[in-house]
Amino acid sequence: MEWLIYIVILFVGIAAGAFFGISVGRKRAEEALEKKLKAAKEDAESIIKSAEKEASEIKKKAIIEAREEAHQIREEIEKERKKREEEIKQLEERLLKREEMLSKREELIDKRENYVENLKIELESKAKEIEEKAKEIERRFIELAGITHEQAREIVLQEAREKYEHEIAKFFVQIKTRYEDEADKYAKKIIADAIQRYAPEYIGEVTISTVALPNDDMKGRLIGREGRNIRTFEKITGVDLIIDDTPEMVTLSSFNPLRREVARRTIEKLVQDGRIHPARIEEMYEKAKAEVEREIKEAGQDAVITVGVGGLHPEIIKLLGRLKFRTSYGQNVLAHSVEVAQIAGLLAAELGLNVDKAKRGGLLHDIGKAIDHEVEGSHTDIGAEMLKRYGESDEIINMVMAHHGQEEPITPEAAIVAAADAISAARPGARREDVENYIKRLMKLEEIAKSYKYVENAYAIQAGREIRVIVQPDKTDDATIEKLAHDIATRIENELQYPGVLKVVVIREKRSVSYAK
């Protein structure tokens, strides 16, 4: 039993030891946990303080950056404001200068107007003075000489004419020089700009065409038995077929380029086909005619596209195409019309006028030449009638009538079209005249110049585009020759027709000769 007691005591001791160990371990665990909690709490407080510190620094940094950015924005806004103020200031200065220039121009215009008004008053005063003197002289003549009123009047007029002719000539030169210089410079600038901006190629038109043949045997086949082929050809086409000794070539002659072109193509088709007889000639003629009709339509459309004019009636476009086969003084009329339209458009643009209207009038100004050989009347009258029929405006019709002076221009564009027509026609090499008309025109030029008083001789030069007039130096002066040049030019304009511009040059030469012995 004793050993049982020892066992019980042992178990009790073990249990007590275990309980004591557990108690001690729990206490230590609680202490360790408390330490960990305390350490964690301290760490948390440290992290919170660190985060608060970092947040405070970030906040300060953000505030500083925001202030710097706001300052930079304010500086940029201030720079932009100063820049705009400077631009406004410069603009105001430019406007002020422009106002000053306009004011000076107004003053200059006022001065010129005052000068003209004073000059007018002075002239009226002189005229009145002349009239009073004339009356006084007339009265004295009647009293002293016992002549009639009409005789006295004639004597007075003759004396006044001789006395004041020189003064009138000098006054004419002054007025002409003063008021034409600026206009002349401006006009030359505009015309020069227009011409240099439009410089087309040009090929002179002739009245004959040549067709190459494969061999000379073809000439006999074209003539046919007893000349029946050539007679049929000339009857159908209305063109002369000239067959001479020129090897492998025949010549077509006609003043009508349209008929000549149809005839040329007919010959080419006959030569290519090889079968030449009257029936075949008629067949090939119809084919060539149809080809040319298509080409006429295409030429009209190309001209309209080139110039940039729209809304034309199809029949007007067809008439334009026919101008491709029409010449005037050797100049192709369609090429001339396109050139006039382009020059008129450039001039209108320079002067701030209606460019489209000027181009339209320029393109259509010679439209009547398409059928003037088929209808009675001048090409301007025919053209105006055709345009009216196909719905063109009165302004365009006036351009057609005014470009040769049959009507007064009712719009500035009409005057521009007339000027463009003259520029195109006056271009060197653009036009030709036949020899007979050319010689007659030169003779008439010299005859007009020689008809004036104090003219010694006159010579037409530069292919009739200039006439030089030699005057007596001892009976004229520099003032009177200006008036003489103006009078001759005016008479030439009224009495002669000529392409382009004609220059009148009056020459006064004084020579003194002495001999040394």
From Swiss-Prot:
Its annotated compartments are:
Cell membrane
Record-annotated KH domain positions: 207-267
Q: Supply the EC number(s).
A: 3.1.-.-
Its principal location?
membrane
Q: How does it sit in the membrane?
A: Single-pass membrane protein
EC supergroup of this enzyme: hydrolase
TM region positions: 4-24
What GO annotations for molecular function exist for this entry? RNA binding; RNA endonuclease activity
Family matches, as PROSITE patterns: HD, KH_TYPE_1
Would the keyword Cytoplasm be found if you checked this record's keyword annotation? no
Q: Which Pfam families match?
A: HD, KH_1, RNase_Y_N
Give the UniProt keywords, A-Z: Cell membrane, Endonuclease, Hydrolase, Membrane, Nuclease, RNA-binding, Transmembrane, Transmembrane helix
One Gene Ontology cellular component term attached to this UniProt record is: plasma membrane
Give the UniProt record's GO annotations in the biological process aspect. mRNA catabolic process
| Classification via SMART domains | HDc (SM00471), KH (SM00322)
Q: What does this protein do?
A: Endoribonuclease that initiates mRNA decay.
- Which PANTHER family would you find in this protein's record? RIBONUCLEASE Y
- Can you name this protein? Ribonuclease Y
